[in-house]
Amino acid sequence: MQHKYDIATAMRLYFIAGSQDVTHFASDPADNLLSVLEQALQAGITCYQFREKGKRALQNPIAYKALAIACRNLCRKYKVPFVVNDDVALAVEIGADGIHVGQTDMPPHQVKRLCTGKCFVGTSVNTIEQGLIAQNDPNVDYFGVGPIFPTQSKEDAEPVLSPAFITQIRANHIDKPMVAIGGIKVKDVAMLMAKGANGVAVISAITQSNHIEKTVKELLR
């Protein structure tokens, strides 16, 4: 199926966040997320993933869904793809553009079936074997590789890889759109793309920034 977004282009600067990532601000975390997301969208992020997970995430299902819808609406306003992490039922219900699943989440073929092909599907890759499986699975449209560097943003992060792993992925003829993730800073972007990544996914680089517009522009440089 043809998606309305070019996925390789969407991977250029992929922002991932939930309210748990913006609790360091003074006001309500849900409001904080919407503020940070809109600033990032205005500055030029190319994709956003709603990832509401962990001990500090919203626990109330009504508030959770309302926040997801508000994030989706912002993404639509700026014509940027809106991806939901793991929660396939939510993604289908609110009309997400994409769904991202980890290695222990629902298999991509089931995700594609449940969203009746209307969503693009991404998965997480931490080994060459997983990369080959993703490459050969017609239900996988892109994959995230990482963590490339140590990260504090994910409580359940896999073992740290290295930038060289991206080169190894491409050397194994794995050519689907690929985004690097995990502890990535502005200074790392050009090097990671030179090794074969289509772009970078970041959480704290944006959520911890004192000047979101400047940071996003630098990440896109």
From Swiss-Prot:
Annotated EC: 2.5.1.3
Pfam families documented for this protein: TMP-TENI
Reactions it catalyzes: 2-[(2R,5Z)-2-carboxy-4-methylthiazol-5(2H)-ylidene]ethyl phosphate + 4-amino-2-methyl-5-(diphosphooxymethyl)pyrimidine + 2 H(+) = thiamine phosphate + CO2 + diphosphate; 2-(2-carboxy-4-methylthiazol-5-yl)ethyl phosphate + 4-amino-2-methyl-5-(diphosphooxymethyl)pyrimidine + 2 H(+) = thiamine phosphate + CO2 + diphosphate; 4-methyl-5-(2-phosphooxyethyl)-thiazole + 4-amino-2-methyl-5-(diphosphooxymethyl)pyrimidine + H(+) = thiamine phosphate + diphosphate
Any one Gene Ontology molecular-function term assigned to this protein's record: thiamine-phosphate diphosphorylase activity
Membrane-spanning residues: none
Top-level lineage group: Bacteria
Residues that hold 4-amino-2-methyl-5-(diphosphooxymethyl)pyrimidine according to the record: 49-53, 85, 124, 154
Cofactor: Mg(2+)
UniProt-recorded name of the protein: Thiamine-phosphate synthase
Binding-site positions, 2-[(2R,5Z)-2-carboxy-4-methylthiazol-5(2H)-ylidene]ethyl phosphate: 151-153, 183, 203-204
GO BP annotations, alphabetical order: thiamine biosynthetic process; thiamine diphosphate biosynthetic process
Biological or metabolic pathway of the protein: Cofactor biosynthesis; thiamine diphosphate biosynthesis; thiamine phosphate from 4-amino-2-methyl-5-diphosphomethylpyrimidine and 4-methyl-5-(2-phosphoethyl)-thiazole: step 1/1
Cofactor binding, note field: Binds 1 Mg(2+) ion per subunit.
GO cellular component, one term: cytoplasm
